[in-house]
Curated annotation (Swiss-Prot):
Protein name in UniProt: Methionyl-tRNA formyltransferase
Source lineage: Bacteria, Pseudomonadati, Pseudomonadota, Alphaproteobacteria, Rhodospirillales
SUPFAM superfamilies: FMT C-terminal domain-like, Formyltransferase
Entry similarity comment: Belongs to the Fmt family.
PANTHER family with a match to the protein in the record: METHIONYL-TRNA FORMYLTRANSFERASE (PTHR11138), METHIONYL-TRNA FORMYLTRANSFERASE, MITOCHONDRIAL (PTHR11138:SF5)
Binding site for (6S)-5,6,7,8-tetrahydrofolate: S109, L110, L111, P112
Keyword line: Protein biosynthesis, Transferase
Gene: fmt
Molecular-function GO term, any one: methionyl-tRNA formyltransferase activity
The keyword Transferase is assigned to this record: yes
Length: 305
């Protein structure tokens, strides 16, 4: 098929790669504009832009698709279909209608649960037992289109966002190729409207969500550690220093929230206790909590912020 791909982050790259490997003619890639990043604030291409550039595929990076000129340029591509995966821009109706078969979205949740920007992290934060991928026919709403394909994956008590990200990207890459094959064979999958019940929204992650509130249940805080690394990261304050928690475990224990209960940095929470296992001090490399404690003791009874 002659298709346009629209995507931006690392999640989208395996999906684009699978379309190329399946023999589809990717005539153009749309991605978000380069943005300053790193200490030098040099402009960096998005992961999808960089990948497409390496493959010699033309890339367009409009700031918006609302201008009539941008919509006309898109329509002039005369694509059979557009595949969208974590693109990050709103598609006006004129864009949705331009490809012969419309626009298909690869979304990292079991819709209608977790519509929106951060479905992978929100599923872990909520303690969901499962999540998955939905392939949908896009409409003008926010992830409200009819579902063409849906597959689930179980979430374990130790599932992390990076692991789930990679699993779902691979699942989405396989599923979109299968969906397009059925469309090519004139055996389109049934378009199932999303149910009205069970709608939730995966709001964009905010930096302040990473602060550990010891008044909460340790189970919730462990979910934060697993969901919010590497970004925005999870941390607590100690003597004015921000210490990141990269891995942790829930343990039995009780005390005033934020109190260090032993020499292993077990910290009392609103319910149960949390023991950081891997941490990172400001300007330092990641280390085990025991390594940090050898050089920077945190006595039992210390109350952390």
């Amino acid at each position: 098929m002659k298709l346009v791909f629209m995507g931006t982050p690392d999640f989208s790259v395996p999906i684009l790669d699978s379309l190329i490997e399946a023999g589809h003619q990717v005539i153009c890639v749309y991605s978000q504009p380069p943005r300053p990043a790193g200490r030098g604030h040099k402009e960096q291409l998005t992961p999808v832009h960089a990948f497409a550039h390496e493959r010699g595929i033309p890339v367009r990076t409009p700031k918006s698709l609302k201008p009539a000129e941008a919509q006309a340029e898109f329509a002039a591509l005369e694509a059979d279909v557009a595949v969208v995966a974590a693109y990050g821009l709103i598609l006006p109706q004129a864009v949705l209608d331009a490809p012969r078969l419309g626009c298909l979205n690869v979304h990292a949740s079991l819709l209608p649960r977790w519509r929106g920007a951060a479905p992978i992290q929100r599923a872990i934060l909520a303690g969901d037992a499962e999540t998955g991928i939905t392939i949908m026919q896009m409409d003008a709403g926010l992830d409200t289109g009819a579902m063409l394909s849906r597959e689930s994956i179980l979430l374990a008590p130790d599932t992390t966002a990076p692991w789930l990200h990679d699993m779902l990207a691979a699942m989405g890459a396989r599923m979109i190729v299968e969906t397009l094959a059925r469309l090519e064979d004139d055996e389109p999958p049934a378009a199932t409207p999303q149910p009205a019940e069970g709608v939730t929204y995966a709001h964009k992650l905010a930096k302040e969500e990473g602060l550990l509130d010891w008044r909460r249940n340790a189970v919730e805080l462990d979910r934060k550690v697993r969901a919010l690394n590497p970004w925005p990261g999870v941390w607590f304050e100690m003597a004015g220093e921000r210490i990141k928690v990269l891995e942790a475990a829930v343990t039995p224990g009780s005390g005033a929230p934020g109190t260090v209960l032993d020499d292993q940095l077990t910290i009392a929470c609103g319910k149960f206790a949390l023991r950081p296992l891997k941490v990172q001090r400001a300007g330092k490399a990641p280390m085990t909590a025991s390594e940090m404690l050898r050089g920077h003791a945190i006595p039992k009874g210390t109350v952390l912020g």
